[in-house]
Amino acid sequence: MFGFGHHHNQAPAAPSDPNQIFKIFCRANENYCLTVRDSAVVLAPVNPKDEHQHWFKDMRFSTKVKDGEGMPAFALVNKATGLAVKHSLGQSHPVKLVPFNPEYEDASVLWTESKDVGKGFRCIRMVNNTRLNLDAFHGDKDHGGVRDGTTVVLWEWCKGDNQSWKILPWGPEAHSSSPGAATACTIGGVPVHTVRVFSAAGEDYCLTVRNGTACLAPKNPRDDYQHWIKDMRHSNKIRDEEGYPAFALVNKVTGEAIKHSTGQGHPVKLVPYNPEYQDESVLWTESKDVGKGFRCIRMVNNIYLNFDAFHGDKDHGGIHDGTEIVLWKWCEGDNQRWKILPW
């Protein structure tokens, strides 16, 4: 995009802390930040407390993956959703969001920053096509500027302020005081955030372990039994029939993994987790988006059986403290739609 001979331009410094959170904004209006809304990447008025505006700049592939100008690759992973920004279909198409698999080198979620294009701003472009850049669609002055909900697309470089970006750490005003906010564990020496798991039928109830069973309980960040590790170590080689990567859900306190039940209507089980052993009975996948960012969680080897908050639908009275998790065929119920998000 800027021609050859720019390898001497310094790349932005990599974050020293993998858990550091960033804000992303463009020169067209620095009072609007990149966020996730209704499963789309848009701009919204800056709000340090809105975790949908918090991003991880994941540099784990930066030493071996670089663009044509030698700039290091990174992924942009949303803190609230765990989704990564993915390349669009081409120029003028909105960028996409997909579940981030930190163990799999997927070029379609990798980006680089250009040299400085003025006042510290840089282009953010596809690692394998530096001619296509993040673009706040119609965010230039001629089209009325950035507004709440401006879509982010890819576009060739037009020297627009709506194509010039900064990725900067949030200040202390963005850091939540909630006890679980910074909870992290390590998998293979890599820091990973614990996650919470909840359904669309009752977002104030989280998956927990109680008396040897997996059930739902009122959300409590202080309750470590509600903290789970989404272990993706087998995802490179194990996928479901739709191509989605497999993962295990391991409880932080008990070290137990959620295991497939004996069939429809039966509760899921908990078993000791052996991370070195490839056991498909503890592996799950997430479906495509089934509405507002929720997804089905289903057996890796039988995607027709899904997590189901038993009798958690409105017709049966909804979610309550102690609602059991069973497997059930897809009935389009809110009690079958789930999110797995960082605490």
From Swiss-Prot:
Among the GO molecular function terms of this UniProt record, one is: carbohydrate binding
User: What are the entry keywords?
Assistant: Lectin
Q: Which Gene3D superfamilies match?
A: 2.80.10.50
List, alphabetically, the InterPro entries matched.
Answer: Ricin_B-like_lectin_EULS3-like (IPR040249), Ricin_B-like_lectins (IPR035992)
Recorded hits in SUPFAM superfamilies, A to Z, give: Ricin B-like lectins
| Domain annotation Ricin B-type lectin: ranges | 194-340
Coiled-coil ranges from the UniProt annotation:
none
Q: What is known of its domains?
A: The ricin B-type lectin domain binds glycan structures.
Q: What does this protein do?
A: Lectin which binds carbohydrates in vitro. Interacts through its lectin domain with glycan structures containing specific motifs.
Protein name per UniProt: Ricin B-like lectin R40G2
Write down the species: Oryza sativa subsp. japonica
From the UniProt record, report the name of the gene that encodes this protein.
Answer: R40G2
